[in-house]
Curated annotation (Swiss-Prot):
InterPro entries: Cytidylyl_trans (IPR003329), KdsB (IPR004528), Nucleotide-diphossugar_trans (IPR029044). Its EC number is 2.7.7.38. Activates KDO (a required 8-carbon sugar) for incorporation into bacterial lipopolysaccharide in Gram-negative bacteria. It catalyses: 3-deoxy-alpha-D-manno-oct-2-ulosonate + CTP = CMP-3-deoxy-beta-D-manno-octulosonate + diphosphate. It comes from Paraburkholderia phymatum (strain DSM 17167 / CIP 108236 / LMG 21445 / STM815) (Burkholderia phymatum). This is 3-deoxy-manno-octulosonate cytidylyltransferase.
Length: 267
């Protein structure tokens, strides 16, 4: 992990909602004797954030956070995304324009605190960017062609050129449009490294306050990728490249069982 030597002050916000179709009440799922959302917040604390808080529209999540000594804020229930929820929090607290706010997903109890700290540092070190995120190289050809694996192409400065569910960049001489078997595809050629986007974001508070006023963009709708809204409106996104893939989050009961085993708990 390439981390800036002097990490700037930053705030970590954990958006959490109970309305999960695949895993109801996910933030409250027990992981080693603590609710998942608390485990996530503890990772955020380990990152060195000067403030960690849980943003939720559920009273049960708010109460659990406070019971474990974690700051929490009740937000509106009609937010279409976690970024919109963060925008409400930023407006409520009135953080200064250049304060860095990291969105730590509430279903990532195994998130590496160094990665949280890293995206905050990367944003502070990259002039002209309102957002920072992370990515790692893809080595499995199946992931290159998997639309559920979001790819990102950064420029020479490490600023995102585009995010897509499609295989980008397309290595013209290495790939054929109709492979009979994905398993037979070659790994991405070195000159055209393919990066998998990691869904961790750091924002400047000024951007968060303007985000709700940005109109939904055609490319955001086509790709179903929220970050493309910011790019459509001219914002630049810095990309921190790390060699290691993060441990997966919790989306399904099987994911939960795996994480519970990691923490030595029982389902």
């Amino acid at each position: 992990m390439n981390d800036t030597q002097h990490t700037p002050p930053f705030i970590a916000v954990v958006p959490a909602r109970l309305a999960s179709t695949r895993l109801p009440n996910k933030p409250l799922a027990d992981i080693g004797g603590k609710p998942m959302v608390v485990r996530v917040a503890e990772r955020a604390v380990e990152s060195g954030a000067q403030q960690v808080l849980i943003a939720t529209d559920a009273q049960a999540v708010f109460d659990v956070a406070r019971a474990h000594g974690i700051d929490a804020m009740m937000t509106r229930a009609d937010h279409p995304s976690g970024t919109d929820r963060l925008a409400e929090v930023a407006a409520h607290y009135g953080w200064r324009d250049d304060m860095i706010v990291v969105n730590v997903q509430g279903d990532e109890p195994l998130i590496d605190p160094a990665l949280v700290r890293g995206v905050a540092s990367h944003l502070a070190a990259t002039d002209g960017c309102a957002i920072a995120t992370a990515a790692h190289p893809i080595h499995d050809p199946a992931d290159v062609f998997n639309p559920n694996v979001v790819k990102v192409v950064p420029d020479a400065r490490g600023v995102a050129l585009y995010f897509s569910r499609a295989p980008i960049p397309w290595a013209r001489d290495a790939y054929q449009p109709h492979w009979p078997n994905i398993a037979q595809m070659p790994a991405p050629p070195a000159p055209a490294a393919v990066y998998r986007h990691i869904g961790l974001y750091a924002y400047r508070a000024k951007f968060l306050r303007t985000y709700p006023s940005l109109s939904i963009s055609p490319i955001e709708q086509a790709e179903a990728l929220e970050q493309l809204r910011a790019m459509w409106h001219g914002e630049r996104i810095a990309v921190l490249v790390t060699n290691d893939a993060p441990l997966p989050g919790v989306d399904t009961p099987d994911d939960l069982a795996r994480v519970q085993a990691f923490f030595g708990s029982s389902a």
